[in-house]
């Protein structure tokens, strides 16, 4: 614990009024080192913990805010809504799960599509939100990503996706699996147009998202220590009946084995993307 956070004198009391002035969650603890920092400092550091470099999760709007020039962007397809076509129910009906996710996140779905400029280059971008039903890909997520890709190749823009997902959305059955083929087919059109696709892989990126558009980029950028794979480590371990290699499915392991092109600290991500766009769009 930092010395400036340690109480030096016993018996010091704080009044109820002073306690109420302290914002909830003002102090944040690093899950790796146990160190503590101020939430404002953490937010100014793009949710990367000072010192340890631990990357906390971000939502799509937070990524858009620091990647687009001056944080200026236009959202698209926010009117799309998922429906419970199968009347699916596990612990609670899928329709209720959707309502809860919308209320808790303030988002319409697990992905947001936007256009704007990055380093002066017009860009089509799609960012996922893990907080919305685990960032799972259902029909609306697939359609939104497909439209973002189409927007890129019809308007002559590069594409950037920010993946964070638990995979296909089981509540939509085969409808969710169809999104893998849909997004992949649209990426073929983008490739035919000769436009670059930069895929950013954050923690975690798994399942059907990994098995489709997230791993079809021209350049794959991963955040440090991100879990990236198809099935999760526990499922694989139980299937093969043996322990996995150290760090298996982490971004560093994947880079070492050629599945990821580069690992970039979030604080340097925008600069790296601008350099890549300058090279690819010449």
Curated annotation (Swiss-Prot):
Any one cellular component term from GO for this entry? acetyl-CoA carboxylase complex
The Gene Ontology biological process terms listed for this entry are:
fatty acid biosynthetic process; malonyl-CoA biosynthetic process
Q: Which residues are connected by disulfide bridges in this protein?
A: none
Instruction: Please list the reactions this protein catalyses.
Output: N(6)-carboxybiotinyl-L-lysyl-[protein] + acetyl-CoA = N(6)-biotinyl-L-lysyl-[protein] + malonyl-CoA
Where found? Cytoplasm
Pfam families named among the record's database cross-references: Carboxyl_trans
In the Enzyme Commission scheme, what number(s) does this protein have?
2.1.3.15
Q: Does the keyword NAD apply?
A: no
Q: Which keywords fit this entry according to its UniProt record?
A: ATP-binding, Cytoplasm, Fatty acid biosynthesis, Fatty acid metabolism, Lipid biosynthesis, Lipid metabolism, Nucleotide-binding, Transferase
The record's GO molecular-function terms, alphabetically, read: acetyl-CoA carboxylase activity; ATP binding; carboxyl- or carbamoyltransferase activity
> Where is this protein primarily located?
cytoplasm
Report the HAMAP family cross-referenced here: AcetylCoA_CT_beta (MF_01395)
Task of the protein: Component of the acetyl coenzyme A carboxylase (ACC) complex. Biotin carboxylase (BC) catalyzes the carboxylation of biotin on its carrier protein (BCCP) and then the CO(2) group is transferred by the transcarboxylase to acetyl-CoA to form malonyl-CoA.
Q: How does it assemble?
A: Acetyl-CoA carboxylase is a heterohexamer composed of biotin carboxyl carrier protein (AccB), biotin carboxylase (AccC) and two subunits each of ACCase subunit alpha (AccA) and ACCase subunit beta (AccD).
According to its UniProt record, which protein family does this protein belong to? Belongs to the AccD/PCCB family.
Its recorded name reads: Acetyl-coenzyme A carboxylase carboxyl transferase subunit beta
Which organism does this record belong to? Salinibacter ruber (strain DSM 13855 / M31)
Q: Which gene produces this protein?
A: accD
